[in-house]
Every structure is written in C-alpha cells, then in structure tokens.
Amino acid sequence: MAANVPPSAETLLSGAAAHPPKTAEEIANQYDLLPKLIPFLDRHLVFPLLEFSSGQDDDKEIVRAKYELLKHTNMTDYVANLWQEINNSDTIPDEFVKKREEVLAKLQHYQEESAKITELLQDEDVVGNLRSDKVANLKFLEEQHGVTPEMVNSLFDYGRFQYSCGSYGNAAELLYQFRVLSTDNDKVASATWGKLASEILTTSWEAAMEEVQKAKESIETRLFNNPLGQLQNRSWLIHWSLFPFFNYDPARDVLTDLFFSPAYINTIQTHCPWILRYLAAAVITNRGRAHKSSSLYQKQLKDLIRVVRQEGYEYSDPITDFVKALYIDFDFEEAQKKLGEAEDVLRSDFFLVSAADAFVEAARHLISESYCKIHQRIDIKDLSTRLGLNQDEGEKWIVNLIRDTRVDAKIDYKEGTVIMNHPPQSVYQQVIEKTKGAFFRTQVLSAAVAK
C-alpha cells in the first residue's frame, strides 16, 4: 500500500529544487545549431554567425574560433589583429608581414592580367554588341578586340582572390563578368555560388535571391544524373538561403515554397532536419503578414504539421515542439511552456533573432484561435495565463483578437469570460469537407500510378 501513497509536499519541493527550470542561456546553449550549420556554409558565411555569438559566449573562445576560421584566407590584416588579441601582443609576426606582401603582389598581378577585359566590359559600345549567345560573344571579342579564353578565366581567378581578401563587392562584379562570357559549366556554377556568397555578405538581398534561383536551376540541370550531388548542393542552397530568408521580406514566400517543394522537403527530412526550425518560424510568422492569403497559409500550416509529426523522432526543439503541442497533442499548457522556451531560442539564433517578436505574437494568436475553437465559454484569466500574459494584458489581447478576426463572440466583463458563438456545421457541409480531402488524395494516387 505504501507504494501508492502520494508524495508529500516536502518531496515535491525537494524534487523541484533538484530540477529547477532552465535559464534562457541554458535553453539557448542546449538548442544551439551552430555546429550543425557550419559544415554547410562557406567559411566567410560562418563569420557573421561567430560575430553574433560574441555577445553570448566566451569572447576569448570566439576570437580564437574567428582566427581558426579565417587564417587560411587572404584577409591578412584582420587575421594578424586576431593573432595579436589572442596572444596579447603589440607586435605582428614576420609570417603575417610576408603574407601581406604576397597578397598585395598577387592582387597587382591579377589586376594587370584582367585589365584589358575589364576595361572592355565597362565600354558601353562593346557591351551593346553582346548577345545572349556566349559563343558568339567570345568570337566577337576575339575578332574585334583580341580577347582570349585565358583573359576570361582571369576574371574568375581575380574574383575568387578578391573574395578571399574579403572584398565581396569587387568579387561579385568580377564573377558576374566571368559568367557572362564563360562556356565552362563547372566554373560558371562555381562563380554562381561565389556571387551568391558575395551578395549575402554585402547584404544585397535582391541580388542574392536572383543567385539563389540561378543556383537552383544549375542544380536541376548540371547535376541531373547525379542524385547524391543534387542532395549535397540542395543542402548547401537551403543553408545559404537562410540569410535572405528572414532579412528580405519578398524572399519569405519564395523560400517557404521552395523548402516545401518535394525535392527540398525531402532533402530537409533526410539530410538536415534542423532546418525545420526555420521553416516552422517562417510559417508561423507568416500568419501576421497582411498580404498572406488565408487558404495558402492554412496549406503551409498543414504541411508543417505533417512534417513535424513525421520528423519528431529525428529532430525537435522548442519551436517544433510548440507546433506539436498545439496541433498534434492539443496540449495548451505544453504549448504555453514551449512558447516561452521558443522565445529564448529565437533570441539566441542568428537567423531568427529579428523574427522573435513576430513569432511570439503570431503564436499567441494561434493558441487563442485553437483554444476558442474548442470552448464555448472561456475564462479570460485562464486564457491569459495560457498566453503568458497577466489578466489586464490578456483582456486587451482578447478584445483586439475579436476585433481583428471578426469572430462572433461576446465578452462578459462581470463574469470575466468570453462567450463564443460556434454556429453548428450541417451534416451536408461535413460530408463535403471530408469528400474534398478524399477526392484530392485519389487524384494524387492516380497521378502517382500514371507515372
């Protein structure tokens, strides 16, 4: 019988003390994705992530990590400064002085080697005679201006060198010029990735999105018979796309659609399931965007719920757990708890920190909408608690929700409740809704069999 005796208050309190709630810093560290992201990023793209970590982690460790990251680049002055900081020294070792001289000499060499062709490509008369046919362009430049294939390749080499020096704007321009003329598909693909990285690092988001599209097309065509190569390249593109994803509003819809497309959602599920964090954040924050159509948003939400359910065994964090709690388990208390943890994770994530407030706002709307759908009479205090608000804030929130969504509800201030008017759905309407889903699934199966 003793085994069935409920635990005493003292036992419960001692247990709570032994497992106190995690701090925001502990939650952030537990769900830090940096080690998973680094293998899919160019070293120059990793640098902003380390810079962001400077205010959160041990500064000495971050400085050392920056040094290890960049020591093989041609950013010699910056690397030398990092070495001085690590070693607490005012002098610069001879190896850095020597490397700096070598870098300057190479820059001079590349500049001279590509001088003729860069001048030609800045001449409006010459550019005006160029067409979409690269072979014809090369023939025209060779016959009229003595341009050789080696001169074209010098643009590629010079662009790569400028990128290694951290001159991303110059690199983007040189790689663009090379791509206009070159017929070397492998080098053109490499130039596209280099230009994408350069546009990201100069925060030229519109140009970056153009390069995302070009990289996507290159993956589909150049690697058509190489499934493993496509998987690897799609994984890179997914990770590189995170930079414009939350920094450039027009990119949000384009990239959300891309990530949900069959080839890319399959890549995420098989190769990098942690990207679900960013997809979930994008879908949830899409709720508050004025131009977003309700039907498209509902479709994205359904797709997200499906993927979170499928991948729960493989990857989870407070953001995906929030989706699971609210839409799979229908556990409002757990959803509230996970929302609090999700906010800590969002504010410590380089890509999501700017979306944290929008996520919390949208998530509260989703909690309240789901809660209101299944309750006829709602206690304002109870709903406020579930939203992580005090009663006054909760009351204002609910008033705004009713006004903004035009839901049929009345607030009884005396009783402190909200009375929801849920019109009964006719049997005919229920049959129609169920038939719609069955008809769609039949179409999908028929299409699959036809293939």
Curated annotation (Swiss-Prot):
Oligomeric and partner information: Component of the eukaryotic translation initiation factor 3 (eIF-3) complex.
Subcellular location: Cytoplasm
Keywords from the UniProt entry: Cytoplasm, Initiation factor, Protein biosynthesis
Entry annotated with the keyword Protein biosynthesis: yes
Lineage top rank: taxon: Eukaryota
Protein name according to UniProt: Eukaryotic translation initiation factor 3 subunit E
Ranges where the PCI domain occurs: 256-425
Record has Cytoplasm as a keyword: yes
Family to which the UniProt record says this protein belongs: Belongs to the eIF-3 subunit E family.
GO MF terms, alphabetically ordered: translation initiation factor activity
SUPFAM superfamilies (alphabetical): Winged helix' DNA-binding domain
Primary site of residence: cytoplasm
PROSITE patterns: PCI
Gene Ontology BP term (one): formation of cytoplasmic translation initiation complex
Cited function: Component of the eukaryotic translation initiation factor 3 (eIF-3) complex, which is involved in protein synthesis of a specialized repertoire of mRNAs and, together with other initiation factors, stimulates binding of mRNA and methionyl-tRNAi to the 40S ribosome. The eIF-3 complex specifically targets and initiates translation of a subset of mRNAs involved in cell proliferation.
GO cellular component, one term: eukaryotic translation initiation factor 3 complex, eIF3e
Organism (species): Aspergillus oryzae (strain ATCC 42149 / RIB 40)
